[in-house]
Amino acid sequence: HRETIEMFRRVRDKNNIPAAVMLDTKGPEIRIKNFKDGKTELKAGQTFVLTTAEVEGTNESVSITYKALPEQLKIGNKILIDDGRISMEVTDLTATDIVCKVLTGGEISNHKGVNVPYVHLDFPYLSEQDEKDLVFGVKMDVDFVAASFVRSKEDVIEIRKFLDYYGGHHIKIIAKIENMEGVQNFDEILKHADGIM
């Protein structure tokens, strides 16, 4: 990435083009893991299990990346996968499994995002990878950080403090609103971010 940024800046400066460099964080996200065949088909009405156990995904179950998810959900919660293309309702919970009824079926493939609307999930905003990426961004003197999956003003404040600590006071934060919690907290996020995406 360093070479790409340096090349971009050389071309920008040579041609006197006003263009900025933005670093996009991964953000706090939950994803499904892998299916045996890379994908499967889910039908409305069927039972499907999201599990913290390491399993090879089938049309009956798949592993998820966030181990504490079962303990933070309740029966009746809705779960959206792949930007809402697949929807489910939680019907039962164990220490490792989230048993769901598929509401909206379709094809589902490896590494799709998992979203739980109206449920505050208690996990840290900045991952270890995000921290490494932000330090790199400060070293490369990026102009903006696109902060993925911002849920509240606290997420923006956490990034601001982190950037400031490493000398990135000038870096502007663009909050990416990508879930229901972010929508619900839109006004407070807007007051603390330099922009919204």
Label each residue range with its predicted role.
Residues 1-197:
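Non-catalytic helical/linker scaffolds that mediate oligomerization, partner binding
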